Amino acid sequence: MKPKTIIDKIWENHVVYREEGKPDLLYIDLHLVHEVTSPQAFEGLRQKGRKVRRPDLTFATMDHNVPTVNRFVITDEVARNQIAALERNCREFGIPLADLHSEEQGIVHVIGPELGLTQPGKTIVCGDSHTSTHGAFGALAFGIGTSEVEHVLATQTLWQHKPKTLQICINGRLGKGVTAKDVILAIIGRYGVGVGTGYIIEFTGEAIRRMSMEERMTICNMSIEAGARAGLISPDETTFAYLRGRKYAPKGEEFDKAVERWRALASDEGAKYDKTIEIDASTIAPMVTWGTNPAMSTSVDGVVPHPEQFESKTEQNAVRRALEYMGLKPGTPITDIPVQHVFIGSCTNSRLSDLRAAASIVKGKKVAPGVRALVVPGSQQVKKQAEAEGLAQIFIDAGFEWRDSGCSACLGMNPDIIPEGEHCASTSNRNFEGRQGKGARTHLVSPVMAAAAAIYGHFVDVRQLEAEPVC
């Protein structure tokens, strides 16, 4: 039998209908829903007199527009209406909802895995581009638009052209202070935001295998920033250990049977990819973005580049525009860039291990004068556990603001806005113009890099710092 990739296996397992020259009709195993991209979809069902085909394969929460200081005081009318609409729609159509009173509420891409909804071999969709996060479990997960949200609600299927396959192999071990966030930023920085266009990426190699599930989620989360339709990692013992005992994961003998099926999903030895990229893990350093897309990045010991370093006029002009927006001069050492804001959170880096890592840098220190620092847990479960471990108190003692769960300052859609012209060291995934607020200047970094920037008031090389034990 011809060796297959995990991408091929999952895709073929879910084709409901195929016609040459047309998209395949795929069955969807899990549909995650939030308040921003779903109201029009539900209204479409209502107008057409349709029901949700599989409420049991649908799960909803609110995250994008949720205030993180007091979640029950929603002053923005649009946000208030969207949240109320989600509650109303879930009641009407019988969809499970983790609402603002629920201990299970959080960012949709954080709670899916922690509840055990996300499982290997599943097709998973959500009206959010960072649905690729769930690929860390060996699932085929991708974002969809509002019209597609309606289609999945009504039919539990989706029309999709099959992308090509791209293997990115990270060989060897990562050095001290280098994290999963640095790996994905380095990939995008070296190969560009279009490297994955037209592909689904499978991440492989020793460095990936040595990562925890939460680190793998960071990698897959930002595969969309590399232009890919999705990103995933073949499941292994780390995957199975994470899922065991989760609320919606199989139990007892059923779990053992599931593990047998999940093991068979891994890409076969000798499977062919349309393209392969290999990277030596030891060449990756802590990364910082200096521009207005995730590829505009360099190592923390680097400098802001000159436009003339880039080959094409188009690239040179893009760099000039980015530097003007960011208020940076070519040749400036990255460690000389001051920050006025620090945001530790988002679906990329708001899990318990992220907060532990950040707290290990912060413990016993104080936030630098003139810096406002936020820590926003990715879910209420993460918040509860972080408080139980004493992590929250470490942040509070250092001068950080400790918040409720939500998307927060990742995007300029809720009260957590970065002011115009100010620099923010952010653990989120996008640094486009205005992403964190009009005129906000975003630098994407890992949780430890963000924590260090909060303490020192500028970027520092975390490889030169000593972390404190926190648990």
From Swiss-Prot:
<feature type="binding site">
    <location>
        <position position="347"/>
    </location>
    <ligand>
        <name>[4Fe-4S] cluster</name>
    </ligand>
</feature>
<feature type="binding site">
    <location>
        <position position="407"/>
    </location>
    <ligand>
        <name>[4Fe-4S] cluster</name>
    </ligand>
</feature>
<keyword id="KW-0456">Lyase</keyword>
<dbReference type="InterPro" id="IPR004430">
    <property type="entry name" value="3-IsopropMal_deHydase_lsu"/>
</dbReference>
<keyword id="KW-0408">Iron</keyword>
<comment type="similarity">
    <text>Belongs to the aconitase/IPM isomerase family. LeuC type 1 subfamily.</text>
</comment>
<comment type="function">
    <text>Catalyzes the isomerization between 2-isopropylmalate and 3-isopropylmalate, via the formation of 2-isopropylmaleate.</text>
</comment>
<dbReference type="Pfam" id="PF00330">
    <property type="entry name" value="Aconitase"/>
</dbReference>
<keyword id="KW-0432">Leucine biosynthesis</keyword>
<keyword id="KW-0004">4Fe-4S</keyword>
<keyword id="KW-0028">Amino-acid biosynthesis</keyword>
<dbReference type="GO" id="GO:0003861">
    <property type="term" value="F:3-isopropylmalate dehydratase activity"/>
</dbReference>
<comment type="subunit">
    <text>Heterodimer of LeuC and LeuD.</text>
</comment>
<dbReference type="InterPro" id="IPR001030">
    <property type="entry name" value="Acoase/IPM_deHydtase_lsu_aba"/>
</dbReference>
<dbReference type="InterPro" id="IPR050067">
    <property type="entry name" value="IPM_dehydratase_rel_enz"/>
</dbReference>
<dbReference type="InterPro" id="IPR015931">
    <property type="entry name" value="Acnase/IPM_dHydase_lsu_aba_1/3"/>
</dbReference>
<dbReference type="GO" id="GO:0009098">
    <property type="term" value="P:L-leucine biosynthetic process"/>
</dbReference>
<protein>
    <recommendedName>
        <fullName>3-isopropylmalate dehydratase large subunit</fullName>
        <ecNumber>4.2.1.33</ecNumber>
    </recommendedName>
</protein>
<dbReference type="InterPro" id="IPR018136">
    <property type="entry name" value="Aconitase_4Fe-4S_BS"/>
</dbReference>
<dbReference type="GO" id="GO:0046872">
    <property type="term" value="F:metal ion binding"/>
</dbReference>
<comment type="pathway">
    <text>Amino-acid biosynthesis; L-leucine biosynthesis; L-leucine from 3-methyl-2-oxobutanoate: step 2/4.</text>
</comment>
<dbReference type="InterPro" id="IPR036008">
    <property type="entry name" value="Aconitase_4Fe-4S_dom"/>
</dbReference>
<keyword id="KW-0479">Metal-binding</keyword>
<keyword id="KW-0411">Iron-sulfur</keyword>
<keyword id="KW-0100">Branched-chain amino acid biosynthesis</keyword>
<dbReference type="GO" id="GO:0051539">
    <property type="term" value="F:4 iron, 4 sulfur cluster binding"/>
</dbReference>
<dbReference type="InterPro" id="IPR033941">
    <property type="entry name" value="IPMI_cat"/>
</dbReference>
<feature type="binding site">
    <location>
        <position position="410"/>
    </location>
    <ligand>
        <name>[4Fe-4S] cluster</name>
    </ligand>
</feature>
